[in-house]
Amino acid sequence: MTPEERELIVGLFGRLQQFENQPRDREVEALLAGLIARQPAAPFLLTQTVLVQSV
């Protein structure tokens, strides 16, 4: 990982942090948790996708 890639990832999660306390749909959270349990690479792939689309 390059320093630039690290900065992009940390920046993305910093932007997401502002929404951390907003209400979330429990059913959606449960579905996502189950899907991530079956596909553990999903957070990596989703992060990569978001960063590619935002550049």
Language-model regions, residue ranges each:
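N-terminal leader-region detector that preferentially activates on the first domain or presequence
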Residues: 1-55
